[in-house]
Each structure stands twice: as structure tokens, then as C-alpha cells.
Amino acid sequence: MSITAGMVKELRERTGSGMMECKKALTETGGDLEAAVELMRKQGLAKADKKSGRTAAEGRICARVSEDGKAAAIVEVNCETDFVAKGDDFVKFADDVAAVALASSAMTVEELLAGEMRAGATVDQVRREMIAKIGENINVRRFERLSSQDGRIASYLHGTRIGVLVELVGGDAELGKDIAMHIAASKPLCCDEKGVPAEVIAKEKEIFSAQAQASGKPANIVEKMVEGRIGKFLGEITLVGQPFVKDPDQTVGKLLQSKGASVVRFVRFEVGEGIEKEETNFAEEVMAQVRAS
């Protein structure tokens, strides 16, 4: 069977591979398009596995909220370079992962990867195809899904690198967005004092006590100094204690109280946080992309 230019074009569109690779696959499969796709997927998986150990610390945060605002999902999908993170293929893949995360009942990344992204292909299979096509390691690092019976889920994305989900009871959509925006900017550790681990407070109290005692002041004064510093510390790390970014004269707690609302929980993702990125200069990064193409 002769291999036509149209067949090669269609295979290129479906696989994102080069013209010669597509023509070779079609020749090897006797012009069977589906068999050629399968062959190239197998070849792509082999290439993908070689790249799967490389550090992927760039990427984007994507979020999806249900139409009724009762559920939402947020995901972090990583790649190796900012260049790839801005590409249409990667953007679509990351957004599709968020859609799968919202629709599925997956509890772990492994379960999410095993979920169906399109007919006949799991998230992980599509991920591996992306690796073969783009030439960089791609990793679905983490996700969270929130649902609310009594309130709503608000979301906020600061560009593509920071994302927040907030479960809010009371208030309106605008308040939810404002609170999510505040969390993106101020990075609170938890909602309120109840969420601060006891060991964290104990450690800070020990440090503040040592500092206060070094002042040589009486014990009762030292105790008040420590209490004051602990209060300030809690105000800095808890959502309700922080000055609201759009109106620093009031705390987030006071704002919520004035609106008759409360925050049940929140999730904040930032691209690459906690990942040790390999140092690569610009020239080396360009050369790496050229070699992979």
C-alpha cells in the first residue's frame, strides 16, 4: 500500500512526531493508521522512560470548579523549563488533568494517573505521549479536591504559578475570591490558632522565652513579653490573624465576621515549592532543548 502525504499529515497531527518518523511507522504497519499510532506510542513510551528521572520544577497550577460551586480541584503539573510550561500542548494537558481530578474519585496521584483522560487512554498514557512529543519530563505532582455541603468553593489563580481553593460558608462569590487572593499573596499556614501544631507553638515559645529572659527583666514582665510575641506570631501565620491585603487596617478575621462568613479550609499550591531545581545556565538550557528536538 502506498503511503500518501495525507496519511503522513494525519499521523503527524495525532502524534506530534516528525514527518520521517510518521512515514516510517506507516511503512512498517502497511499504511494502517491505528497500528502506526500504536507503534509510535510504544516507541514514545520508550523515549519517555529515559526522561522520567529528570528534575521537573517548572510547570503550572490549574484549577476547576463545578458549575454549582460545590466542588473544585487543583493540580500541579510540572515540566523542566518555563518555555515548555507556556506551550499550548502543555497548557491543555495540565487543564485536562484538572478536569479529570474534579470528575474522578481518585484519592492519590497514582489513582489520578490511572483515570481516563480520553477514550482508550489514561492520564499517565497521555503524559508519556507528551514526554515523547515535547522532549521533557512531565510530572503530575499533586492535586487536591474540595467539596462543600453548606458553603461554596472559591478559587484564585495568580498567573499560572500560584493557585488557591477556599471553602467558604456564608458571604458571596466576591468575598470568596478576595479571601483566595489574600491566601495566594500572604501564604498563611492555617485558618486559625486551632490549626497550628502544638509543637510549633512550643518551639516558638521556647525561643521567645530565651530572648525575653536575656533582657534581664522580672519574670512577670518576661511572661507578658512572651505572650505578646506569641500573639504576634499567630497573627502572622494564621489566615484570620493576618491584615487583609486589600485593606490592611482590618484583619481577615474581622472581614469575615463583618460578612457573617467563615473559612472552613483552604489549599494553596505554588509551582516547584519544595523541589530542588538543578542549576542550568541559559546556554545549556537552549542546547538541551535543541538536542531533544
From Swiss-Prot:
Function in brief: Associates with the EF-Tu.GDP complex and induces the exchange of GDP to GTP. It remains bound to the aminoacyl-tRNA.EF-Tu.GTP complex up to the GTP hydrolysis stage on the ribosome.
A Pfam short name: EF_TS
Region of interest (Involved in Mg(2+) ion dislocation from EF-Tu), residue spans: 81-84
Native organism: Methylococcus capsulatus (strain ATCC 33009 / NCIMB 11132 / Bath)
Presence of keyword Protein biosynthesis: yes
Localization terms from the record: Cytoplasm
KW Transit peptide (keyword) present: no
Signal peptide range in chain numbering: none
Record keywords, A-Z: Cytoplasm, Elongation factor, Protein biosynthesis
Example GO molecular function: translation elongation factor activity
Highest taxon in the source lineage: Bacteria
Similarity comment: family membership: Belongs to the EF-Ts family.
Major subcellular location class: cytoplasm
Identification of the protein by name: Elongation factor Ts
One of the record's GO cellular component terms: cytoplasm
